[in-house]
Amino acid sequence: MGYNKSLRYSRHEGTTCVIDNHHLKSLGSVLHDVRRKKDRIREAEYEPIIDLADQYMVTEDPFRGPGKNVRITLFKEIRRVQPDTMKLVCNWSGKEFLRETWTRFISEEFPITTDQEIMDLWFELQLRPMHPNRCYKFTMQYALCTHPDYIAHDVIRQQDPYFVGPNNIERINLTKKGFAFPLTCLQSVYNDNFEGFFEDVLWPYFHRPLVYVGTTSGEIEEIMIEVSLLFKIKEFAPDVPLFTGPAY
């Protein structure tokens, strides 16, 4: 096909097609303009919904709120769980707890060294199967507002339990409403009298949890239980610097 003079002109009479760099645009900028236009359309659709939603308040996860999380791992232990039953995790009776087959105590020292304000206390439970290729889920039941003189059973039957959260980790908030935890030096109390630390220091201001765990398996399973307490400490800046130097 040779040169055709008529190709220089458009199909419209009296006009010509002029192509120069002033009328060219990169494809990326075109796509960017399309995306921005879609975002503006989407924002215009959500504006009345957002105005209505601003009139309501929703609760957030208090574990992810302000403050610093300090963990104290009490023990790791292997338990044998029978089918259709649930075992008590911890009876809070001092350093023995409920030792069965193998127990390892982790924290010998209390992690909070100074007088700090305790905002929240969490009971964290991590469960792991001890044998590979086991297809079952972990179940759990717990009670908070039990009578102080109530003696919990070591084994109960499963009745309407719920499944443990993602990654086989479950956290329970132990904070009592209307109770403020005093500023005390917890490290000395923890190190001097571990057995009386829970009864004298924690349980007057926080709930004493009775936690039972089980499995959906039809066989006897060995599970690893790791029990921790998470203290949420209020972080605040001192009025005057206590130290001077580049490290502070």
Curated annotation (Swiss-Prot):
Stored InterPro entries: Polyhedrin
Annotated GO MF terms: structural molecule activity
Disulfide-bond pairs as recorded: none
Keywords, comma-separated and alphabetical: Viral occlusion body
Highest taxon in the source lineage: Viruses
Annotated Gene Ontology cellular component terms: viral occlusion body
Keyword Protein transport: no
Keyword check for Repeat: no
Function (record text): Component of the virus occlusion bodies, which are large proteinaceous structures, that protect the virus from the outside environment for extended periods until they are ingested by insect larvae.
Family according to the record: Belongs to the polyhedrin family.
Protein's recorded name: Granulin
Upper classification of the organism: Viruses, Viruses incertae sedis, Naldaviricetes, Lefavirales, Baculoviridae
